Structures are given as C-alpha cells and as structure tokens.
C-alpha cells in the first residue's frame, strides 16, 4: 500500500464511523482503496492481477482467512474471519489525488470488470461518477 492509499484508508475509516454506516445499506464491507495521481486511473497498473477476482468472490461465495496471516502488519483482534456473500459487500474506493479534492467513489468490482471487458483501459472521474454506487466526501 502506498502512502496516499494509506491516507485514504484512514480518512475512509473516519468517514465510516461518522457517516458511512448511516448512508450505506446494512452490510459488512470489504474495501480496496485506490488513488489516481492523474486524470486517468489505469486498470493494468492500478490493480494487481488477483484483486478484482478476489473482490468479486466476496460478493458471490463464502470466504475465509486466518488473521494470523496478518500478524506482521498489526495486532490482531481475533483469529479468523468468515464472510457470507449475503451479508458482505466488496467495493473499490477510488479517489483522484489533487489539491482540495475530498470526493471518493465506491464502485462494485463487477462494474469495473464490465468496463474493462468493453476494452476500456483507464477510468476517468466522469466515468467513475456513472458507475459508482456511492459518491462521498471525506
């Protein structure tokens, strides 16, 4: 995770506690945070090969992982996590980095996959507005 993605995660966490849980449907959310430094968010360099398929899997089948896999990153609060596609929603949060911009877009990974399948190589902020399920301010 790059520094700006880490900053976006921190801001999204604050947004979730103050606003997000009130405006989004009741669910557990898995969020992949992405930032773009230019007008275009390039899909090939912006996503690792496994990220979109994994996020889509959260929306379609039960998932599990051992928290001990994350021991090197931070203190763990429990040992395992299980998700159910009925109660879990995976989303991509994208923010374009520029002075004063506080807007972020929550987009379903399936929508991004559909855009890629149409031959689009990069996402503009205008396109993000069209496919986002939620547009928020940090």
Which residues make up each language-model segment?
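Acidic-basic catalytic patches of nuclease active cores, encompassing PD-(D/E)XK
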Residues: 1-25, 138
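Helix-rich interaction surfaces within compact, conserved domain-sized segments
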Residues: 5-6, 96-138
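Charged/polar, solvent-exposed surface patches and flexible loops
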Residues: 10, 14, 57, 129, ...
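Conserved catalytic cores of phosphodiester-cleaving nucleases, focusing on short active-site segments
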Residues: 22-39
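Short connector loops at helix/strand junctions that flank enzyme active sites
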Residues: 26-30, 50, 85-87
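Mg2+/Mn2+-dependent nuclease catalytic core
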Residues: 36-61
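Nucleic-acid nuclease catalytic cores
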Residues: 56-111
């Amino acid at each position: 995770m790059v520094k700006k993605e880490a900053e976006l995660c921190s801001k999204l966490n604050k947004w979730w506690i103050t606003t997000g849980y009130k405006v989004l449907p009741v669910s557990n959310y898995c969020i992949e945070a992405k930032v773009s430094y230019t007008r275009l968010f390039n899909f090939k360099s912006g996503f690792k090969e496994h990220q979109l398929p994994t996020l889509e899997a959260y929306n379609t089948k039960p998932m599990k992982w051992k928290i001990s896999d994350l021991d090197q990153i931070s203190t763990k609060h429990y040992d395992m996590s299980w998700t159910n596609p009925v109660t879990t929603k995976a989303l991509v949060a994208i923010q374009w980095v520029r002075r004063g911009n506080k807007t972020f877009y929550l987009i379903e990974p399936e929508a991004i996959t559909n855009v890629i399948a149409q031959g689009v190589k990069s996402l503009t902020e205008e396109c993000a507005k069209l496919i986002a399920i939620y547009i928020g301010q940090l």
